[in-house]
């Protein structure tokens, strides 16, 4: 805070104020927030969406019908592209015109903790699917037959099981039985369905040896079950566990993928669709390195407070941003660069009062939106003269 020049005597006090008001994003480790383009919320089971947003198609036509089945890793949250978007765009570029089907088609609002958010980073894709935060294999096995009968997918792309292991602690015999039941139910509704199972990708919880062993065991179960139950009429393939996901770089909260993690999950499924089913080509490598963090720039306004030496900041929230860093410089004192306050503010702290300013000095502020540990778009700078 030394170069913010809010009065050298008050620098420590300003830092103390920032510490007092800054709290971690719900479930996220914001203390390790990353700057834009660099690289933890727990995987909570939440209520699944219930409203059907896509009516069953009357005719399949020549386009392959794909239904993606998954949990929060697949559904995504506010401001995301999602890995479904990455796969869909890849297939389109390959000349494949997939028809994405399923009962859902929206994001989870990770800030307000509600469903039916439509703030996709790019909404111009087919986002129908069967993916929801909290979805678990042991529940989905009982309803997948009805969904397959309704939406008639040619391909099921499935990434499930993490919630079963992490939240419910099922052992491998139960997981294997549930997996077999899922396959049987899907085939009963559509005997020639093609299924691709994704392996559980790496996440921060797998740093614990016991949970890592549980995930590794289930991934082996997926592979062995696919081999055992695959048939010529209804083949089953297995996609890799995220094509080399780096937990520190590719997940915004240690579990859910950012833009770079999305690409790696999509690539795993794309490669299997190409090699096993001749649907498109393998995902091109090397994978691009994409910017991470919120993409929408917050709109900042600032005004003098009615209290001396204070200013009130408010900003329009960016989709998915659960926290914001405040940057400040004292223009009157001659500061040429912004100094970031040491701790992020949660979204609920908008508006926020900056205190311990020097009366009569003009200050410039800006805020940076962060989603978990990924910090992205900056606001416009806004200036005020301290009362």
What do the predicted segments below correspond to?
Residues 69, 250-297:
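Histidine-centered active-site loop/cap adjacent to the catalytic His
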Residues 325-358:
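Recognizes extended acidic, P/S/T-rich segments that occur
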Residues 354-373:
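Beta-strand-rich modules
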Residues 1-36:
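Secretory targeting and sorting signals
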Residues 278-320, 359, 374-387:
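Pro/Thr/Ser/Gly-rich low-complexity, intrinsically disordered linker/stalk tracts
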Residues 202-240, 262-263, 268:
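Substrate-gating cap/lid alpha-helix
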Residues 159-163, 184-217, 240-242:
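Active-site segments of SGNH/GDSL-like serine hydrolases
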Residues 74-177:
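Conserved SGNH/GDSL esterase-like catalytic core that processes O-acyl groups on lipids
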